[in-house]
Amino acid sequence: MSVLLFGVSHRSAPVSVLEQLSTNEAEQAKIIDQVLQSSLVTEAMVLSTCNRVEVYAVVEAFHGGLSVIGQVLAERSGMSLNDLTKYAYVRYAEAAVEHLFAVTSGLDSAVIGEQQVLGQVRRAYATAEANRTVGRTLHELAQRALSVGKRVHSETGIDAAGASVVSVALGMAETKLSGGLGGRTAAVVGAGAMGALAGAHLVRAGIERVHVVNRSLPRAERLAKNLTEQGVVADAVGLDDIARALVDADVVLSSTGAVRPVVSLADVHYALAQRTLAGAEHQMVVCDLGMPRDVDPAVSGLPGVWVVDMDRIQREPSARAAAVDAEAARNIVAAEVANYLAGQRMAEVTPTVTALRQRAADVVEAELLRLDNRLPGLDAAHRDEVAKTVRRVVDKLLHAPTVRVKQLASAPGGDSYAEALRELFELDPQAVEAVAASELPLITTDLDKTE
């Protein structure tokens, strides 16, 4: 069994396609349930962010597993399988491992080095673990990926430039607004993690006033209070009053995770009309960071309004440029992938080695029993010495070849050595499988260590 990845991301598809595939946790659970109904899939996890939807699964067969996952995603998105595959990418076995490590490290993000994806992978794994849809393989893969991501961010400067989607969007807004963001007013739509991140960037940019708009007013009030404590004039606005919050906003940042746009054409049109009546400036930059889109596409056609969406961010040179230490990050990922795969190959041969040692122990015990029957008068002391000697001989004979076979098995193609052991010593495949099952680790959520 190997890991299969079926995914669609900002690198392979336009925002409109990602919108069709965008899912919440409840929908992700349904996708996993459908995928696991097939006997070809034994474990599954869904990673859904504003920039990607990826299904990681442990499959019995590549083509069969690929067909199952592709069909489920096509049905959930309302697309035909043929249309979906035009935008999809597939990674299998080693390539799937390398991809997830790169994702958690921020190397596959719209803006190289952004850290939010590490938390998103953590939540995806936690959800799958809570729903018991991951077993040994995905458990070990996810835990190692989180560890690799943390190492990359702590040992390199890949995120030194604050390379998040928010910072790039605001950088683009500053170039559009004469005089930058200092002393201006912003509207932050959505008071979740992205909203809080947007607020932090706005404070650093010298923004003077922030309207925090959210469906849950108490949540908006909490973020507004936090911004006020940082020296910004901030207030909370319910989503129903969003048009009012846009009237004096020079820049709008929206990322809510809503199914439909929350910033409508009517809302922005109303805000512009109020500005006209007041004789105020019409210029407004709207940063749509939502997935699906938070902003009605028609808004971009209004005079004086410039919309920054995910497609535009991806085309921004600063978003495509690697951080200073990106190469170092890639080297870490490559080394971690090699170490992980070597460990996995070694783990695969371990049950065979254990079964061989058990087979040898059984032979020793059988011969000692035969000795007891042939020499019933042998005293206990001599019998124990003979037993120890025989066991030492067997251990010494097996030590070098078993250690060596583990070393050889860790290299690519090393599974042939385990097969050779099974053939040479006529080891029962069922006995080997029984040993492997007994050696499965207790699956525990170890999220704190990767934060």
Swiss-Prot record:
CDD domains: NAD_bind_Glutamyl_tRNA_reduct. The record marks 99 as: Important for activity. It comes from the Bacteria. It catalyses: (S)-4-amino-5-oxopentanoate + tRNA(Glu) + NADP(+) = L-glutamyl-tRNA(Glu) + NADPH + H(+). Its EC number is 1.2.1.70. Pathway: Porphyrin-containing compound metabolism; protoporphyrin-IX biosynthesis; 5-aminolevulinate from L-glutamyl-tRNA(Glu): step 1/2. Homodimer. Belongs to the glutamyl-tRNA reductase family. This is Glutamyl-tRNA reductase.
